[in-house]
Amino acid sequence: MSDSKELVVVDGGMGSIVACAAARARTLSMGSDGHGPTPVWLDRGRLLSDAPGFDRLFESLAVETLEQHPDPDLDRRDDQPASLTLLTATLGAADHGIAHVVWPIHAGVDGRPSEMDLELAARHVDTALLVTRLVALDSERHRCASIRVDTPYADFSDRQLAELALDLGTPFRMAPWWNDSSSEEYRRWRGVFEAIGCVAAG
């Protein structure tokens, strides 16, 4: 089992970009013991663009996609419950001996950069705790009893997440949606960066 590695659940949004950058920073801080790419689990149903469009971004973030065995009936459904995706990703992490899963979801409110939805944040945390317990119950099979799911940005507003993205020097401009001015994700985050006075947002 790898105690140092972490798996990041990725949908291609700002939260997952920040989480991958943060994981990379932690890896580099470990020196020779922390070499190697960060494993990620693609949330294909919610991926904000076709996966190949993220190749340059993923290369910049030094991540690798964990081998997944997609269910053709579920894997690309955008109505698949987030809890089911998280459960599948956490089981995948355990099967690969990875004991730490990062679910970079946040409770920001679209159009109100400084606000967050407290009730939604609490649901995200509860979901992570329940998935952790469910997967731990299956530890006799995967031998990863210490598995845990963290939600480091659950109570972040859009503004806080954007500021962290800047602090970490994340390459969010390489995301396909950032180069598509018609996308909802671009509209949302362009507005956030403008609100915090980031003149280099474009």
State where each predicted segment sits.
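ATP-dependent adenylation/nucleotidyltransferase module used to activate substrates
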Residues: M1-P171
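Cys/His-clustered metal-coordination modules, chiefly Zn-binding fingers
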Residues: D150-G202
